[in-house]
């Protein structure tokens, strides 16, 4: 005999349990739409990272083979100045783009445009100041970096002088590629950097092979590459996918730049510690080992740039996408994003690791090794050094992820350890100990890098546990706030009838009033019908989320169809007459739209 009283009590308890945990039956989003867009960002991201790092690697290879190994070392000795020159463009570009992503996720286009305009102007002005200082300061700076007045000092002076002159161009270029990623144009950002570095590659060969410019030509080709490729930004200016526009700013409006600075603190710390890292490592290696140690370190550092070049583009998708998802409180999407990026990154890293271990000798020859005793030392050091890339990639992921969810303290902590606090003592200790073993100490450089990355991973785990007790690595919840119905449908008319039914059933189970439930169901059905009719061939999946928070009912619809802003729609012809849009506007409390991650995102509240 069935005990109906117990059965009703069981059903009631199950309903309460679902309310606490989220709607398990309703959480049927398949994430195909988001995964499709992430795949679209990955290739441009890799190309952008490849192009960004390729300039440094190409300069090093050409300089070592067409001038000398000393000239190659001068490129590395110039890194502290290069870091300072790039500081404004990098920090305001990354910090600004993440902050703008959060603003766009909240549908605040006005503030986003103000921040974009302010960061552009500040980057340009700071770059011009560097240009004015180039001629009077290049010589004394070079003597500080390379004391003793050797040929290495002259090479360093010539290289940094051109870098400082080109600061406005480099700064604006670096700033814009970050904004293009969050502005639905990741492919344009990657094309810009690829083209800039193709130009750099061609000019490098011409200047070093056929002109007396010497190392000055290597630096000049980088600046000219960034400059000549800027015509591509005209495509962005004319794009109908833009959310950001240049606006006239009053003096008080520049206060908004603090948003970019606060969000970009991890990058600011990274650039500042990179300066300390470059200066500190150069000093330690030159004093403890000498120019041979500097040559070996330059090769190892360029291999790390290759790792950065291939995996950094994948990890670099996180700031472009996670900031917008975080602004929308789409925590499920953030989890999907991170797992996918980590999976792809470590697959690529495994291939790089095998390649370096297999072709170590050939790699060192590429960077000017003659295969003698110095070449042998390079091979041994590089085979030890490559083991640092496994924890290095994890630390890079941590920085990108935590700054995207506004956990800048943890991101800065990682950067501070990895680039200064742990690295310099570890490298000094590694050289000192290895010198006792073999009398040379070069392998100690590699050992110091491995120790640094492992220490950083462990220390960051402890720091996160102290700051966020009982939290998971992600810190954000694994479910979206409120009680959610989250599902996906194919972009097909056959699917639309299920939208109305699912929303009505969900609202009935949650005790939502019949009137509000019907409003939500009608709005969702009307919007999906319009998307399917007019979304174009690119529209294949539609994500629908209905969130209940206290007295608020919020409907979010996301699709990858053609650009369509329902807020700007007006009836203009019988051929293109979307009556449902007007109905939705009338029955909803508010309606917001944004084109983000190259998708239409519409939020309707009741």
Predicted regions and their residues:
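Short alpha-helical transmembrane segments in multi-pass integral membrane proteins
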Residues: 2-42, 100-166, 213-264, 322-388, ...
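Transmembrane helical elements of multi-pass membrane transporters/channels
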Residues: 40-60, 162, 173, 196, ...
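Helix-terminus/linker motif at the lipid-water interface of multi-pass membrane proteins
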Residues: 54-73, 142-150, 206-213, 272-302, ...
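Small-residue-rich hydrophobic transmembrane alpha-helices
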Residues: 72-132, 173-182, 188-189, 296-354, ...
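Short runs within selected transmembrane alpha-helices of multi-pass transporters and secretion channels
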Residues: 93, 97, 162-182, 189-197, ...
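Bergerat-fold GHKL ATPase/HATPase_c domain
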Residues: 466-521
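Conserved ATP-binding N-box helix of the HATPase_c
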Residues: 514-539
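Glycine-rich/acidic phosphate-handling loop/turn and adjacent ATP-lid/helix
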Residues: 553-581
């Amino acid at each position: 005999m069935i005990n109906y009283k117990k059965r009703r009590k069981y059903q009631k308890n199950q309903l309460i349990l679902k309310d606490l945990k989220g709607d398990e039956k309703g959480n049927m989003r398949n994430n195909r739409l988001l995964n499709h867009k992430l795949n679209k960002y990955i290739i441009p991201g890799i190309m952008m990272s490849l192009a960004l790092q390729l300039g440094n690697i190409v300069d090093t290879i050409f300089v070592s083979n067409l001038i000398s190994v000393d000239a190659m070392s001068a490129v590395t000795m110039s890194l502290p100045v290069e870091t300072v020159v790039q500081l404004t463009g990098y920090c305001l570009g990354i910090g600004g783009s993440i902050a703008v992503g959060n603003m766009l996720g909240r549908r605040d286009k006005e503030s986003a445009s103000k921040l974009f305009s302010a960061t552009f102007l500040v980057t340009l002005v700071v770059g011009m100041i560097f240009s004015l200082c180039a001629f009077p300061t290049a010589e004394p700076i070079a003597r500080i970096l390379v004391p003793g007045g050797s040929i290495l000092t002259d090479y360093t002076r010539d290289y940094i002088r051109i870098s400082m002159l080109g600061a406005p161009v480099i700064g604006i270029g670096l700033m814009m590629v970050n904004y293009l990623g969050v502005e639905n144009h990741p492919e344009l950002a990657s094309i810009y950097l690829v083209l800039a570095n193709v130009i750099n590659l061609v000019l490098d060969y011409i200047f070093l092979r056929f002109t007396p410019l010497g190392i000055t030509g290597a630096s000049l080709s980088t600046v000219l590459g960034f400059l000549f490729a800027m015509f591509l930004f005209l495509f962005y200016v004319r794009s109908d996918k833009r959310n950001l526009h240049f606006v006239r700013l009053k003096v008080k409006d520049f206060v908004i730049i603090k948003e970019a600075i606060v969000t970009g603190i991890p990058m600011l710390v990274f650039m500042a510690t990179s300066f300390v890292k470059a200066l500190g490592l150069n000093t330690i290696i030159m004093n403890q080992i000498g120019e041979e140690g500097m040559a070996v370190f330059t090769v190892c550092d360029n291999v790390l740039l290759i790792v950065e070049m291939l995996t950094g583009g994948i990890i670099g998708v996180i700031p472009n996408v996670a900031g917008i998802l975080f602004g929308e409180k789409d925590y499920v999407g953030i989890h999907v994003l991170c797992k996918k990026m980590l999976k792809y990154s470590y697959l690529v890293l495994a291939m790089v690791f095998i390649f370096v271990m297999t072709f170590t000798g050939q790699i060192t020859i590429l960077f000017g090794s003659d295969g003698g005793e110095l070449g042998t030392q390079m091979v041994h050091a590089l085979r030890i050094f490559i083991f640092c890339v496994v924890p290095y990639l994890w630390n890079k992921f941590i920085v990108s992820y935590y700054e995207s969810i506004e956990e800048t303290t943890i991101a800065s902590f990682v950067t501070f350890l990895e680039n200064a606090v742990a690295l310099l003592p570890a490298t000094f200790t590694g050289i000192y100990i290895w010198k006792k073993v073999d009398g040379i100490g070069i392998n100690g450089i590699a050992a110091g890098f491995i120790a640094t990355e492992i220490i950083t991973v462990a220390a960051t785990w402890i720091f996160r546990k102290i700051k966020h007790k009982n939290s998971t690595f992600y810190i954000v919840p694994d479910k979206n706030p409120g009680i959610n119905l989250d599902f996906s449908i194919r972009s097909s008319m056959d699917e639309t009838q299920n939208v109305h039914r699912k929303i009505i059933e969900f609202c009935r189970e949650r005790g939502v009033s019949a009137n509000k439930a019907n409003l939500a169901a009608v709005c969702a059905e009307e919007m999906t019908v319009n998307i399917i009719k007019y979304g174009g061939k690119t529209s294949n999946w539609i994500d629908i989320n209905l969130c209940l928070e206290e007295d608020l009912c919020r409907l979010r619809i996301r699709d990858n169809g053609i650009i369509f802003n329902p807020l700007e729609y007006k009836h203009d012809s019988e051929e293109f007459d979307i009556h449902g849009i007007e109905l939705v506007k009338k029955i909803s409390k508010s309606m917001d739209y944004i084109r983000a991650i190259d998708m239409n995102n519409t939020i309707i509240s009741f």
